[in-house]
Amino acid sequence: MALDGNFCDSLRDGLLTSFVDASLASEQNLRAQLLANNMSGSGTKVISVLEQELSRCQQFDFSVAFITMGGITPLLQTFKELETRGIKGRILTTDYLQFTDPRALEKLAGLSNIEIKFFRTEEAGQAGFHTKGYIFDQGQLRSIIVGSSNLTQTALTVNQEWNARLVSAAEGEFARQIQTEFDALWEHSASHPLDDVLDDYQVEYERTKAVRQRFFSAEPKLSAELSFREIRPNTMQKRLADNLLALMQKEDLGGDISVPKKGLLISATGTGKTYASAFALKAIRPKRALFLVHREQIARKSLQSYRHVMGNDYTYGVFIGQQQETDRDIVFATMQTMVKHLNDGPFSPTDFDVIVIDEVHRAGADSYKSIMEHFRPKLWFGMTATPERPDGFDVYGLFGHNILTEIRLQQALENDLLCPFHYFGISGLEINDKDYELKDFSKLVSDDRVDHILKQSDYYGYSGSRLKALVFCSSNEEARLLSQKFNARGLRTVHLSGNDSQSAREEACRRLALEAGDEALDYIFSVDIFNEGIDIPEVNQVILLRPTQSPIVFVQQIGRGLRKHDTKEYVVILDFIGQYNNNFLIPVALSGDRTYNKDYMRRVVATGTQVLSGPSSIHFDAVSRKRIYEAIDSARTNTITSLREPYRLLKFKLGRIPSILDFDVHGLIDPIKIFEACGTYYAFLKKMEKDGEDFGEMDAAAQKYLSYLTQRLGNAQRVSEILVLELILNGEHDNLKSAFIANFVRRFSSNPSEAHLQSCERILTSNFWRTQKEKEDNSNCAVIEIEEDGEWRAAGAFVSTLSANQLFNQELKDLIEFIKIRYELTYEGGYGNTLLKLYERYTYEDVCRMLDWSRNITAQNIGGYFYDKSSRTLPVFVNYNKDDHAIAYEDHFVSENHMVALSKTKRKVSSSDADHIFKRTSEDKDNRIYLFVRKNKDDAEAKSFYFLGEIYAEGEPEPVKVKGDDAFEINYRLRVPVRNDIYTYLTS
């Protein structure tokens, strides 16, 4: 943070807000703050604040009792960046309770900028050491965190922890006290340089660890049969069992009892779908069941899972190749063997009460169709993590659109069903899409690339006793050659492909899972055979060496490491990000957000750890972050091609044509992208259902009205006009202005201003336009007419169109409902006395409307800033990081609440512009200046600006020259500091 002469006043204001009156305005960064892990409330994790503080400090000191690998791994990228910048740090820890992990200390000691000392409690007279303090030197400022959080994974992310973040001038009493205390402990005779004591402590740590393991392993064991029955379902598995039992107990009144029931489980990879199905079948107690899989290895593991859950109440067997145990109660079969013996085999169509199909997204294949046509069970039960198929097959329809339970990656993390992951987006070497397309192996398997991969794999490490990594490549040849190069460097690796036998795959998996020994593998290289089905819970590192082409495949591949196992606390995901067009899919996949909202994508990149529940974290280095931002900017997410797939998937899921409301309910593509692409949802359906279902027709007048209202109101930024439309749809055609005012007061507890009434009037009479062409295009779109006394009445043409077309009625009602819901979720609660919402995005036209201007000003005139005399508002529009061809303004943030900007050219410090901005005249003293910023102009779709609140000009205008023309510099202060994720995105 850049400090100036007002620092003491700002610090005083922060203290007054913190400890005297919370309503007083002050800089957020200078207030005292309670830091707790509270994702459901404030959305914070202690780890995120530590990262922020480290990234802006000039030096740091930590004194913590406990340090573990899980605690430092999420900080490794930040520590590496600090090393590059020469930012030094001191870390003091202790042997207290032999809890601190020596591996973590070794990892930190490998950084040249960090000095570590180790406090020996016995030398200090058996005194305990339980400090948790973090001191960040920011020049004249000290940011200090003290409380309960050690450097451990759970303390920094999920535990109930209380920490206070306090800010002090460097010479302040509190800062001096805590620094003095740290320095005293640092220089204490019991504090030793790490190198002097690490070997001895390693022995002590392992000895204590062994004692703990013996203690826990000494607990009495249950018999094998009893222990099977003691396995308890997790939250997802219990919900599924309850829902399936309810389905089987439900009577289909008037239905055909010979028609089997159907149900679908959608659950993220690693959440325990096989166990879930076993618990579900245990609940409904079928006489016989068939479990169908596509690989022998999965069938045999599934049999063991069922036996663990259901015990000896059933007999179990397999139907695989020559091993055909057909007389068992529950049979586990591969699809290949079953298809081979459908006609001459031992199973009749009614032999099984329940048939479970694992990885049911494969069921579009002819072999699965043959099986489903042959058998007639009482229940078809399908399981998959990814029902969305790019081949057009409708998995949902196959199971009657009956989803018994659905839990995706984010929900699974929230429910602690998966192993936490720490994802690192790392810039690859200069590799792009073309290199993969041309299979340029000279780059893909070069020694430089191999060295780079190994260096990162070693630095970011793993959880557990040794490395057990899966590496996903773009081709088998790349995987084969990389495996060879790794082996040549003394590592133990294999390459697997679809050509390898089942036994070879099983052997490789066994070797990777080993805890020790000469047989143990370090890495397995493959392309896609590990995407699904094969289960190695011990995997503790996943490396992605290919472009992200699909969020589905991305989640499948990182999911190979997400299964929980006793040998690991977390899994490390290393994603080597080249210059790929589809990099924007990475934040989509990590967040699980399928709306393709670009702002949310950017937020994931800027502050990814904060969007994930639990201990998991997301980190990008500077280069990879830049590459993803560029991909987001250039991505086309509102084209017909990009919208077709989510529409198809939602239609499959629902079993009908979706309404515009369904997209938000099911978290799919943002409907506003549909409006941008096609004008209206009706026009979109015409394209989607061109050769499909008939959903009705709308005449030209109705289409024109729907298009006008969608384009003017569909972004849901305000609902005033919607209140009028609802009155008309409810049959009220006269005295609409009075009725609207009454409804407005009920809705917002205040009267609409005269300017706002006039603004609504202009929209509803189709008189808010910029050009003559806009005026002509929107003719005959008036919803209301103005009577002589100023009252509003419904326009006759609009009422007639509503009466003549039921489909128009329904589409308009759906649009209104969508706008109301979106407004309440996104825009309600405007900033100050405006209708604008902080951190939402607005176009030039939006700003004119939201500020109730009488005119819709063209972009050329409003660009930069424009003063509206009637409303006394002056929006300032900043294109941050303009391209080389733009006028060379030097607008830039100094800090989260300070921006330096330049006026338009050919403006002197004595100009009226300066009067408006610096409020130098009596007419200007009540002016309101609002800041809108967008990141360059590179986004291929959006030309909107983030609204960052009210600003005021500080000091006096400074005259400058811009390309020889007069201009003046302005120091703007923001009333509200920019939110961290937005600030990071704009300034990175």
List each language-model region with its residue ranges.
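Post-DEXD/H (motif II) to motif III coupling segment of the RecA-like Helicase ATP-binding lobe
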Residues: 362-422
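PLD/PLD-like phosphodiesterase catalytic module centered on the HKD motif
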Residues: 1-234, 238
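Long, largely alpha-helical accessory region at the distal end of helicase-like NTP-driven motors
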Residues: 207-233, 458, 463-464, 475, ...
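Walker A/P-loop
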Residues: 250-281
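Conserved segment of the helicase C-terminal RecA-like domain
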Residues: 551-556, 560-590
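Conserved interdomain linker/interface between the two RecA-like ATPase lobes of SF2 helicase motors
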Residues: 403-470
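Conserved helicase ATPase core of P-loop NTP-dependent helicases/translocases
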Residues: 300, 318-319, 323-324, 343, ...
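Acidic, glycine-rich low-complexity segments with interspersed aromatic residues
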Residues: 704-709, 718-729, 835-944
